[in-house]
Amino acid sequence: VIAYLHFQKESYVQHLIHEFKYHKNERLAIYIGRLAAEDLQRDGYLTDVDLFVPVPLHPRKMRQRGYNQSERVARGMASVCHHPIDTTSLIRHTYTKTQTRKSAYERSQNVKNVFSVAHPERLAGHHILLIDDVLTTGSTLLNCIDALRDVPDLLISIFVVSTVI
């Protein structure tokens, strides 16, 4: 797991995350993705990645928010290193409420079995970079990985904009 920033309450990182996640600042998410990709590419972390896969939002959440912040981060990263983005193979088929005030156990239960793979053939044999905005307990990412488990010859790396300290 590569975490670009460290999230602490009342910090500038919290402000940045809230800006692009809750205040519709899509361009900030794209910009952070570009900055991260420049650093990761310079340090050789993206050389063998084939495909970016942002953690999907449920369609209802997508309508509420207007965009997927993880997809916007991926778009910024792709503008630097020109990797394709797959937004249709991994899907979130169950709507869940926000995890921000849930315990680790509640988070794990909240996202259990909410992801599935619609197009495993698009991912088979590839090295993907699974992209999310914030890593807190890892429940969301672990459930994404669980959904991807049966895709043949799939290598998964993970990038998050920030991790909670």
Per-region residue spans from a language model:
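A short coil-to-beta-strand element that immediately follows conserved catalytic motifs
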Residues: 51, 81-91
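Extended interfacial segments that mediate partner engagement and assembly in macromolecular machines
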Residues: 1-76
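A local structural micro-motif
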Residues: 25, 48-49, 85-86, 156-157
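Short, well-ordered alpha-helices that flank and scaffold nucleotide-derived cofactor binding pockets
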Residues: 38-42, 75, 79, 142, ...
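PRPP/pyrophosphate-binding module of the type I phosphoribosyltransferase fold
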Residues: 87-165
